[in-house]
Amino acid sequence: MTVQEYRQTRFTPPKGATEILLVRHGESRAARADAPFPLVDGQGDPELAPQGRVQAEQVGQRLQRLPISAVYVTKLQRTTETAAPLCRAIGRQPNQNPDLHEVHLGDWEGGVLRIKAHENHPIYLQMQA
């Protein structure tokens, strides 16, 4: 008996449609209890770690061949740093959009979430359940 296979095909947007590609920022620097991240509008704003800069270069190289008409970033430096290699490669400036932002972590901003996760804090474990 032959089993039918259903192969995945690449989605092609219809003519006139806008295709949106979301890119997560590169790895940011490690959190430390004695050196909390600076805050921008109440959100932790660490810079990219060395590995994050490598990731940003790699994503820039990969995406530079696509027909990109605009690049949008948040106020946070890690998003601007991640977009920089791509923007250089395609000759565009990133558009900072104040309506784009991450989930606000309240008291767990500034790297505290990472520390609580490492400590297996009960609230963090409950969030993961």
What is the predicted role of each segment?
Residues 2-21, 27-96:
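Active-site-proximal alpha-helix that buttresses catalytic centers in soluble enzyme cores
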Residues 47, 88-129:
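Phosphate-handling substructures
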